[in-house]
């Protein structure tokens, strides 16, 4: 067992090593024009609400009861983050230590359920014409937000020069919740059959990793924007990866 003083020295040495690694693999991070912690929180909330909305709408479309809709919303919103934390060795996952994201997910699901319950005509064929467009937008926003959050989480705990890990964690954080949602709805995961999806996450994660040593806030914003733009363009113009018909 290490004494408190030895623990303090060890943590200080690790922090110094971490800063040296950041200087070695990039430049010193410039002073952010935005409070990074606040930016991360805002992006997490945006992603949580967007993914919770997409999960809830799938549940409503599948005629699930209120509990089913809530479960779909929560698992879509936090599923990717749980997988990320397990990969990074964060135990227990942040979802269980800070339940605010589950609370936002439940609130989002309940609001959508009540709206659709009262306005049942919103589920008719004319309203459903817009369903796919709304789903694409919500999914793109959630995908972009959680992709950069995944990269930032791994970066902050010291995996600065593990580029493949940063990419993997960014993508799995972005697509994990959607995969869980689709499997719970007994659908082939969106990532495997629809227009370019994981590739959009991969591109945004790459931009975020490339710019992270220079300016963390800007790298996260630009990375998320890249994901959203690519995903929406891919859905609009039907960009697909090759497959056997």
Regions found by a protein language model. Give the residues of each.
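Long hydrophobic alpha-helical segments typical of transmembrane helices together
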Residues: 214-245
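Helix-coil boundary and interhelical linker segments in multi-pass alpha-helical membrane proteins
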Residues: 34-39, 86-96, 151-165, 210-218
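Transmembrane alpha-helical segments of multi-pass membrane transport proteins and ion-pumping complexes
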Residues: 48-56, 77-78, 82-86, 105-118, ...
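Loop-to-transmembrane alpha-helix initiation sites
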Residues: 97-102, 162, 193-201, 215-224
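Structural signature of hydrophobic alpha-helical transmembrane segments
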Residues: 37-48, 97-107, 162-173
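Interhelical loops and loop-helix junctions of multi-pass membrane transporters/channels
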Residues: 90-100, 117-142, 151-163
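N-terminal topogenic module of multi-pass integral membrane proteins
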Residues: 33-91
